[in-house]
């Protein structure tokens, strides 16, 4: 997230200039950890990486929003560590150039390929519990597809292993290599073809940046997490979001895509002689090449779009309602959200998240919320279906008044208005006004418990209209970046029929596995696909990435969950595992879901 300007506070200047992960806050933190653990010596690049940080504090705004941490503390420690080393007359290692590095530099430029371990170490790990760290021998930053082609020909000739990296959030270990890591972050071309309702995107373009440019022109694109690089995300998952209900997944998202194959040759999806990436095989597949651009579909937006949240006290009821909406094609985005997602996304601190989760479940009786995004006719249809809901006005009051949800006044108000029908208070005329009076929503109230040094900045952030707009928040998804705030998480993602009994079975089994291994766990989300015939389900296991025992238990739980998925898949023939979608994200949705 430190690579995208999602708060409007700016991005680390040295990262934008140098491009390597090491020059971003994320990389500097990984570098300091490696030095502290004695994994690498102090090198020439160490000095430059530390020196280019001016302690401006921009990363504190970004990182605290997501994780409640302040990276400048680490940046100061990094500078102090290097200064102390130099004062003691410590050696500074110079990375020697070798023939392979020389050839790479001849292709991409002197500064865009390196074997310095201060840079390599920041490409040596990902967040996943199953990943084994691998220190790459080289890191290279191509700027064009021609440079990628030349590099792959070189690696093919010299039999050098390589891996291509997006933004490093993939958690299965596929973005690491002991040979060369190819970082595509320099390739940030965005070219709109409005007459053909498409936009061509380079492999270094992040979802947030693309969505921002599309919205400026009155369009929407179906993208995933804000920091995810679009081409990599398309290749690895076919892109999934709550907008899958309206826009589809996998090949539904694109018009065309271009690739460089492992031998350095070029092909595109529209070539008749190209490899058939539209096919799907339910097994692990190798990378067909590097996606150097994708032509994504542009979707129209209307000025009357809005969002509602429909509360339910059981998963079965939430699933029945979401399927009904999908079958009737009500809404562009539909998602069943669990209490963990709801409380974590909405709250600025871990403490408030835990308290709000308890209030939602134990006081309000809300186990699940179904999100619906649509135009005025879709929202009217939801209302006509008779379910109480939080409309945009109530959502704003709830969001900015979250600390007051714990108050006796609010809970007493709900008790006085409750009836036999669950959540009936939401139907009472004038309830929005009563809620605003009881909750006293304001940006100042929402941020009252965060770090005092950052409070005024965040008060201005939460005063922006888009920060309480359900449509904007689900398009740009900056709140979902908080998912790993308390602990890192391991995801279980499957495609399956949208059947309440089957989904209930899976959730119960995923929970049983996690409980057996002593792991925090919860449902993430469920989104209908293909008119409600199928759904995508995410169930999350949480672990402390600094606790070897907890990592070990998560590894065992992940293996058990994988065995569970494969057993259901073999027995029913209708289950698809995200593991098998990796490198098959361009397959036809029909091939993915039904063949």
Identify the role of each PLM range.
Residues 1, 5-10, 72-111, 116-121, ...:
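Intrinsic disorder at enzyme termini
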Residues 2-4, 55-66, 278-295, 530:
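Conserved phosphate/anionic-ligand binding catalytic regions in large, soluble enzymes, centered on
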Residues 8, 15-61, 67-94:
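Ferredoxin-type iron-sulfur electron-transfer modules in oxidoreductases and energy-metabolism complexes
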Residues 19-27, 160, 175-179, 183-185, ...:
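Conserved glycine-rich FAD pyrophosphate-binding loop
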Residues 121, 125-187:
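Glycine-rich N-terminal segment of FAD-binding domains in flavoprotein oxidoreductases
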Residues 147-150, 209, 315-321, 377-385, ...:
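Short, conserved charged micro-motifs
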Residues 158-307:
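FAD-binding core of FAD-dependent oxidoreductases
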Residues 238-247, 254-443:
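C-terminal substrate-binding/cap subdomain adjacent to the FAD-binding core in PCMH-type
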